């Protein structure tokens, strides 16, 4: 490390007399006065030792900066607004279809409300009468037909908008008798992309679920699952 210290408080004044010729050719004495400062220089001993090394090769006869080589000139380019994008974590999950959107925005919301809508029993609709009613005509009697909670209903997602109820009857009817097919429609009258298929028997619904889940239908792959709540309507 080399540093220089100048002490302005202790200048050394010196005078120089110089004889010069003016424009007329006459000799004139010029007196110059100046101040000399004491400068203290600290040098690095290791640097001074390296300067005494013997030069060789192409730098044998060169001195000073002549034997200093510079690398390629590099320009610094600063880009503004460069950010690394991180993968967005899915923090929103629908409670109906388990996909990444709010439950209120779920396209299957309307259809689920239809299947989960409670039905009025015959006891609520008909007033109580003192007249005798046969057991097979009394409210709540369904005979051998399954109750609403036992009806096997399948929700078919990722359905082509070109599919009709007739198409689904033919597709799902090969596994057993189908009692009902429902394709919810939008305000414009087009399919919402899913449907509900209700079987008469649970084993038929299980066969359809096993065979058609992941089945390619009209350039789409069907996704099947049992509806959370089954209804005859």
UniProtKB/Swiss-Prot annotation:
The answer to keyword Cytoplasm applying to this record is: yes
Molecular functions per Gene Ontology: RNA binding; translation initiation factor activity
Record's superkingdom? Eukaryota
- Where does this polypeptide localize? Cytoplasm
Tell me the subunit arrangement: Component of the eukaryotic translation initiation factor 3 (eIF-3) complex.
Q: Which InterPro entries match?
A: eIF3_g (IPR017334), eIF3g_N (IPR024675), eIF3G_RRM (IPR034240), Nucleotide-bd_a/b_plait_sf (IPR012677), RBD_domain_sf (IPR035979), RRM_dom (IPR000504)
Family as reported in the entry's similarity comment: Belongs to the eIF-3 subunit G family.
Function per UniProt: RNA-binding component of the eukaryotic translation initiation factor 3 (eIF-3) complex, which is involved in protein synthesis of a specialized repertoire of mRNAs and, together with other initiation factors, stimulates binding of mRNA and methionyl-tRNAi to the 40S ribosome. The eIF-3 complex specifically targets and initiates translation of a subset of mRNAs involved in cell proliferation. This subunit can bind 18S rRNA.
Q: Which Gene3D superfamilies match?
A: 3.30.70.330
Gene transcribed to yield this protein:
eif3G
Q: What is this protein called?
A: Eukaryotic translation initiation factor 3 subunit G
Tell me which residues make up the RRM domain.
152-229
Query: According to its record, what are the GO cellular component terms?
Result: eukaryotic 43S preinitiation complex; eukaryotic 48S preinitiation complex; eukaryotic translation initiation factor 3 complex
Q: Which PANTHER family match?
A: EUKARYOTIC TRANSLATION INITIATION FACTOR 3 SUBUNIT G
- Which organism encodes this protein? Dictyostelium discoideum
* SMART domains per the UniProt record, alphabetical: RRM
Q: Which BP terms from GO are recorded?
A: formation of cytoplasmic translation initiation complex
PROSITE patterns in alphabetical order: RRM
Kindly indicate whether the keyword Transmembrane belongs to this entry: no
Keywords from UniProt, A to Z, are: Cytoplasm, Initiation factor, Protein biosynthesis, RNA-binding
């Amino acid at each position: 490390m080399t540093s220089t210290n100048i002490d302005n408080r202790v200048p050394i004044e010196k005078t120089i007399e110089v004889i010069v010729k003016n424009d007329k050719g006459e000799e004139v004495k010029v007196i110059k006065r100046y101040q000399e400062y004491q400068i203290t220089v600290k040098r690095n001993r290791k640097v001074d030792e390296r300067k005494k090394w013997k030069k060789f090769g192409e730098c044998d006869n060169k001195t000073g900066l002549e034997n200093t080589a510079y690398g390629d000139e590099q320009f610094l380019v600063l880009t503004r607004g460069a950010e690394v994008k991180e993968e967005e974590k899915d923090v929103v999950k629908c409670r109906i279809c388990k996909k990444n959107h709010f439950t209120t925005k779920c396209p299957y919301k309307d259809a689920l409300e239809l299947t989960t809508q409670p039905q009025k029993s015959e006891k609520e609709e008909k007033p109580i009468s003192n007249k005798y009613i046969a057991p097979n005509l009394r409210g709540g009697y369904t005979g051998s037909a399954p109750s609403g909670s036992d009806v096997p209903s399948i929700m078919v997602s990722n359905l082509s908008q070109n599919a009709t109820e007739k198409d689904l009857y033919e597709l799902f009817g090969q596994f057993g008798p189908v009692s009902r097919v429902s394709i919810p429609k939008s305000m414009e009258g087009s399919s919402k992309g899913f449907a509900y298929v209700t079987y008469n028997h649970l084993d038929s619904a299980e066969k359809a679920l096993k065979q058609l889940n992941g089945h390619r239908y009209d350039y789409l792959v069907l996704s099947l699952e049992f509806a959370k709540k089954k209804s005859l309507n």
